[in-house]
Amino acid sequence: MILSGKQIKDSLGKDIVIEPFNEKQINPNSYNLKLHNELLVYDEEVLDMKKPNKTKKLIIPEEGIVLEPRKLYLGRTLEYTETDKYVPMLEGRSSIGRLGVFIHVTAGFGDVGFKGYWTLEIFCVEPIRIYSGVEICQIYYHDVGGDYEKYSSGKYQNNKGIQPSLLYKDFIN
């Protein structure tokens, strides 16, 4: 079952944390999250799964920044979230998608117990000017059936900002 907007609001401070929270961003069954003003781009000709890849930080100015097609931009949500007993899911807003912008390539699924900012895998099909503070995606929550263990020690848990791929850690050992 997906939580309603009212259930999301009622769970704030208990099983769900969204900081900062703005009631205007609540939808019937989700909450809109905003884009932070920082982006990362990979600074390598060829990315390598077995090693950390160099990145370069971009700051989105007030007048926005034009994203190039066929280039991956890593962004993050302005909001910090925590979930105690629900599965958090992230989807792009349809208004953003209708401009040819994808906010996640594959990672729209969170784990029960996730704490941190959501890293966005932003990709566009045409050049587009984007702005920090835009409501770029929405988070929604599923109930979990059965017993579960909370996510507590994963690579991306308790992050403080944009997280480039840490896949290389899976190759250690």
Swiss-Prot record:
Record key words, sorted: Hydrolase, Nucleotide metabolism, Nucleotide-binding
Top-level EC class: hydrolase
Catalytic residues as annotated in Swiss-Prot or TrEMBL: 121 (proton donor/acceptor)
Subunit structure: Homotrimer.
Catalysed conversion reaction: dCTP + 2 H2O = dUMP + NH4(+) + diphosphate
Protein name as it appears in the record: dCTP deaminase, dUMP-forming
A single MF term (Gene Ontology): nucleotide binding
Ligand binding (dCTP): 93-98, 111, 119-121, 138, 151
A Pfam short name: DCD
Residues the record marks as site: Important for bifunctional activity: 108-109
Superkingdom of the source species: Bacteria
S-S bridge residues: none
Protein EC: 3.5.4.30
Keyword presence, Phosphoprotein: no
GO terms under biological process: dUMP biosynthetic process; dUTP biosynthetic process; nucleobase-containing small molecule interconversion
PANTHER family: DCTP DEAMINASE
The family this protein is said to belong to: Belongs to the dCTP deaminase family.
Job of this protein: Bifunctional enzyme that catalyzes both the deamination of dCTP to dUTP and the hydrolysis of dUTP to dUMP without releasing the toxic dUTP intermediate.
Pathway note: Pyrimidine metabolism; dUMP biosynthesis; dUMP from dCTP: step 1/1
SUPFAM superfamilies: dUTPase-like
Gene3D superfamilies hit by this protein: 2.70.40.10
